[in-house]
């Protein structure tokens, strides 16, 4: 009985995390224009390091352990982030769109090869 409840709890937790991630992406319009994605990236660069520091300080206070000071993350500049992002998305989507026809073509070639060499 406990195993079933634990399994259900794990499923609900994973589903909640996945649903929250989908909601966040939709709410922040990260799949929309590149300007929104760039703004979200800049916001994350500003917010995440202080939050990690505060969380590590909280853990140290609660547990009595001392964590070593982490090095500061390097500053990464994305001058043409928009172009790279868009070209990556276009490449992936075009590959996905031709995948069924390519799979059919390759399977046909493979079948012909097997027929030739099995004689």
Swiss-Prot record:
GO BP annotations of the record are: cristae formation
Give TM regions: 8-26
The record's section on Pfam families has: QIL1
What GO CC annotations are associated with the protein? MICOS complex; mitochondrial crista junction; mitochondrial inner membrane; mitochondrion; nucleoplasm
The reply to whether Zinc figures as a keyword in the UniProt entry is no
Q: List where in the cell it is found.
A: Mitochondrion inner membrane
Output the InterPro entries linked to this UniProt entry.
Mic13
Q: Which domain of life is it from?
A: Eukaryota
Q: Provide the membrane-side ranges marked Mitochondrial intermembrane in the record.
A: 27-119
* Biological role: Component of the MICOS complex, a large protein complex of the mitochondrial inner membrane that plays crucial roles in the maintenance of crista junctions, inner membrane architecture, and formation of contact sites to the outer membrane. Constituent of mature MICOS complex, it is required for the formation of cristae junction (CJ) and maintenance of cristae morphology. Required for the incorporation of MICOS10/MIC10 into the MICOS complex.
Q: Which PANTHER family match?
A: MICOS COMPLEX SUBUNIT MIC13 (PTHR31816:SF3)
What does the subunit section of this Swiss-Prot or TrEMBL entry state? Component of the mitochondrial contact site and cristae organizing system (MICOS) complex, composed of at least MICOS10/MIC10, CHCHD3/MIC19, CHCHD6/MIC25, APOO/MIC26, MICOS13/MIC13, APOOL/MIC27 and IMMT/MIC60. The MICOS complex associates with mitochondrial outer membrane proteins SAMM50, MTX1 and MTX2 (together described as components of the mitochondrial outer membrane sorting assembly machinery (SAM) complex) and DNAJC11, mitochondrial inner membrane protein TMEM11 and with HSPA9.
Q: What is this protein called?
A: MICOS complex subunit MIC13
Q: Which organism is it from?
A: Mus musculus (Mouse)
């Amino acid at each position: 009985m406990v195993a079933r409840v634990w399994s259900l709890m794990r499923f609900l937790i994973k589903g909640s995390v996945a649903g929250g991630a989908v909601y966040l992406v939709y709410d922040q319009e990260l799949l929309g224009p590149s300007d929104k994605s760039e703004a979200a990236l800049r916001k994350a660069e500003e917010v995440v390091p202080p939050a990690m520091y505060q969380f590590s300080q909280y853990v140290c206070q609660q547990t009595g352990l001392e964590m070593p000071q982490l090095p500061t993350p390097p500053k990464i500049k994305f001058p043409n982030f928009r172009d790279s992002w868009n070209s990556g998305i276009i490449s992936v989507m075009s590959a996905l769109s031709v995948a069924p026809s390519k799979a059919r073509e390759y399977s046909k070639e493979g079948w012909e090869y097997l027929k030739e060499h099995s004689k």
